[in-house]
C-alpha cells in the first residue's frame, strides 16, 4: 500500500503534473475531451455533488459551533476537511472549464494561482485524512494508554498542526510558481500541457529528483501513520468486543456508542481513500503505457475526486443530529 501511494505521488499527485517527456503532447490528444459531452457532464455532475455535500457538512459544523454544542476532538478536522475539499473542488471546476470548454485564454497569474492552490489543497486533504485517523485512535485509547493525555487537548493545538501542514505544503509546492506558465503560441514539444491555457516548464533532473523525494518522504510518513492508527483502532475494537460479548443480548450492547460510530466512519473513509488511491495509480500507469490515452485521462479526472465527493456523505450518515435534521426536512418537503 505504501508503494502504491508513493507511485501515486510521483505520477498523479497534482493530477496533471507529470514529469515524463512523453506527456508533452498531452493536449494534442486530450483536446478532444471538450467534444465529449458525456465525459464533461459526468465530471461537472461529480464536482457539483461534491461541492453541495461539503458545503452542507461545513454548515452543520458551523451551526454546531455557534450553538455551543459540546465538540469532539475530531470535529475541527472534519470541518477543516470539508472546507479543504470544497475549495479544492471549486478550483478544479475552474480548471476543468479550461480543459473541457473552449474559452478565453488565461494569463500567467491565473494559471499559477489556480494550479498552485489546487496542488496545496490536494496535499492538505491527504494530511487531514491522516490527522483524523490519528485523532480517532487517541479518542479510542484507554485511560492507561500513553495517548490518553492527548484526549483533552484544546482545539487550538489541532489548528496549529493544520497551520504547520499548510505552510509546509505551500513551501513544497513553491517551485510550481516558477514552472507554471500560460501556454505560449508556439509549436513546440518542450512544454508539458496542463490545460488549454496553462503549461508547465520541464524540470531539470535535480529538481525532478528533489520533488519526487519530498513526495515519497511525505507519503511514507502519512501512510505509516494511517497504517499504525488503523491497526491500533482495530485491536482496541476487537478487545472491546470480546469484553462485551456476554452483553450481546442486552439492548445496551446493540447500540453503538458515538465513538464507535465515528470510528466506523473513519475506517470507511480510509478504505475508500486507499481504494481510490490504488485505482488512481493503476490509471496513471495505464496513461504512461498508452501515451496519455484520452479515455484513461478522463477516467482519472473522475476517480481522483471521488474521495472529496463521497467523504462528506460518510460523515453525515454517522451523525445522528444531521440524519434527524435531514429526515425532518424531507418530511416537510413531502407535506408541502
Curated annotation (Swiss-Prot):
Query: Where in the chain are disulfide-linked cysteines found?
Result: 111-198
> In its UniProt record, which GO terms are filed under biological process?
response to pheromone; sensory perception of chemical stimulus
Pfam annotation, one family: V1R
Cellular compartment(s):
Cell membrane
Keywords attached to this entry: Cell membrane, Disulfide bond, G-protein coupled receptor, Glycoprotein, Membrane, Pheromone response, Receptor, Transducer, Transmembrane, Transmembrane helix
- Predominant location: membrane
Any one GO MF annotation of this record? pheromone receptor activity
Looking at the record's lineage, which domain of life comes first?
Eukaryota
* Positions in the Extracellular compartment: 1-42, 97-120, 179-213, 286-296
- Indicate which residues are glycosylated according to the record: 185
**Topology within the bilayer:** Multi-pass membrane protein
Q: Which residues lie on this side of the membrane: Cytoplasmic?
A: 64-75, 141-157, 235-264, 318-336
Q: Where are the transmembrane segments?
A: 43-63, 76-96, 121-140, 158-178, 214-234, 265-285, 297-317
Q: Which GO terms describe its cellular component?
A: plasma membrane
Which tissues show it? Expressed in 1-4% of neurons of the vomeronasal organ. Only one pheromone receptor gene may be expressed in a particular neuron. Not expressed in the main olfactory epithelium.
Function noted in UniProt:
Putative pheromone receptor implicated in the regulation of social as well as reproductive behavior.
**Family, similarity comment:** Belongs to the G-protein coupled receptor 1 family.
This chain belongs to the protein called Vomeronasal type-1 receptor 102
> Organism source for this protein?
Rattus norvegicus (Rat)
